[in-house]
């Protein structure tokens, strides 16, 4: 998604991901909003987990931005929000090990997300899923459609 230099470059993103059963076939989706323009992204993985789909949605959304932006990224995944805002520094300091000394789960996608986030200024916001938020519900519908249609 392109932004014009010198103009407000705040992009609002809504992401969701899931699979059924977990693990199993999964889908992810992201909706990017910028100055009245919307872009929808979605994808499918035949064998995955909910957390991997949530991470993929956030990474893909940020990768779609063609220039550094100010971003408000809305996710209903506490795993994604806590990982990026609270846990990542410790993981990196411990060479991608968690507090128990075990390798961080989904390390490949966490690294992808960190790379995608590096050039942006991001406000990571958690929203309650399935609580009637129209954009969260829409992202959920797109992710479910991607999962169902493969």
Swiss-Prot record:
Q: Which cofactor does it need?
A: Mg(2+)
Q: Name one GO biological process term.
A: DNA replication, removal of RNA primer
Indicate where this protein resides in the cell.
Cytoplasm
RNase H type-1 domain span: 7-148
Q: Which residues bind Mg(2+) 2?
A: 16, 140
- Which CDD domains does the entry mention? RNase_HI_prokaryote_like
Please name the Gene3D superfamilies in this protein's record: Ribonuclease H-like superfamily/Ribonuclease H
What EC number(s) would the UniProt record show? 3.1.26.4
Cofactor: how bound: Binds 1 Mg(2+) ion per subunit. May bind a second metal ion at a regulatory site, or after substrate binding.
Family matches, as InterPro entries: RNase_H (IPR050092), RNaseH-like_sf (IPR012337), RNaseH_domain (IPR002156), RNaseH_sf (IPR036397), RNaseHI (IPR022892)
Gene Ontology CC annotations of this record: cytoplasm
* Binding sites annotated in the UniProt record for Mg(2+) 1: 16, 54, 76
Its keywords, alphabetically, are: Cytoplasm, Endonuclease, Hydrolase, Magnesium, Metal-binding, Nuclease
GO molecular function terms listed in the Swiss-Prot or TrEMBL record: magnesium ion binding; nucleic acid binding; RNA-DNA hybrid ribonuclease activity
Q: Name one Pfam family in it.
A: RNase_H
Q: Which reaction does it catalyse?
A: Endonucleolytic cleavage to 5'-phosphomonoester
The record's comment on protein family reads: Belongs to the RNase H family.
Function as written in the Swiss-Prot or TrEMBL entry: Endonuclease that specifically degrades the RNA of RNA-DNA hybrids.
The record's note on quaternary structure and interaction partners says:
Monomer.
Q: What is the designated name of this protein?
A: Ribonuclease H
Q: Which organism is it from?
A: Granulibacter bethesdensis (strain ATCC BAA-1260 / CGDNIH1)
């Amino acid at each position: 998604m392109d932004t014009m230099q010198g103009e407000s470059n705040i992009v609002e993103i809504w992401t969701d991901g899931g699979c059924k059963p977990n693990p199993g076939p999964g889908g992810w989706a992201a909706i990017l909003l910028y100055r009245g323009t919307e872009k929808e992204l979605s994808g499918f993985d035949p064998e995955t987990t909910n957390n991997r789909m949530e991470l993929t949605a956030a990474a893909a959304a940020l990768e779609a931005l063609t220039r550094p932006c100010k971003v408000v990224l809305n996710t209903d995944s506490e795993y994604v929000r806590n990982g990026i805002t609270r846990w990542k520094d410790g993981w990196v300091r411990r060479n991608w090990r968690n507090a128990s000394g075990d390798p961080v789960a989904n390390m490949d996608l966490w690294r992808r997300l960190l790379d995608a986030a590096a050039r942006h200024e991001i406000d990571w916001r958690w929203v309650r899923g399935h609580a009637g938020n129209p954009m969260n519900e829409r992202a959920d519908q797109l992710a479910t459609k991607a999962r169902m249609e493969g």
